[in-house]
Amino acid sequence: MSDVADRVKKIVVEHLGVEESKVVENASFIDDLGADSLDTVELVMAFEEEFSIEIPDDAAETIQTFGDAVKFISEAS
């Protein structure tokens, strides 16, 4: 797993209180990991802070899964 994926996974586990084993590429933050809309906003903010990037609102709406987050951040970093 890449450094980006490891860091994203750590943020997801800490913010959503889920087991690391449940955070897989196609795991939906809302459907699979129990996040609500506020959680997803907080995740995006945490990703922005951790990786020193800005995620525009329209892009944030497309980040629905762990894999989406890793892909976006990898391309933006």
Swiss-Prot record:
SUPFAM superfamilies: ACP-like. Pathway: Lipid metabolism; fatty acid biosynthesis. GO terms for molecular function: acyl binding; acyl carrier activity. The modification O-(pantetheine 4'-phosphoryl)serine is found at residue 37. It holds the Pfam family PP-binding. Its main location: cytoplasm. It is found in: Cytoplasm. Residues 2-77 form the Carrier domain. 4'-phosphopantetheine is transferred from CoA to a specific serine of apo-ACP by AcpS. This modification is essential for activity because fatty acids are bound in thioester linkage to the sulfhydryl of the prosthetic group. It comes from the Bacteria. One of its GO terms (cellular component) is cytosol. Carrier of the growing fatty acid chain in fatty acid biosynthesis. Belongs to the acyl carrier protein (ACP) family. This is Acyl carrier protein. It comes from Dinoroseobacter shibae (strain DSM 16493 / NCIMB 14021 / DFL 12).
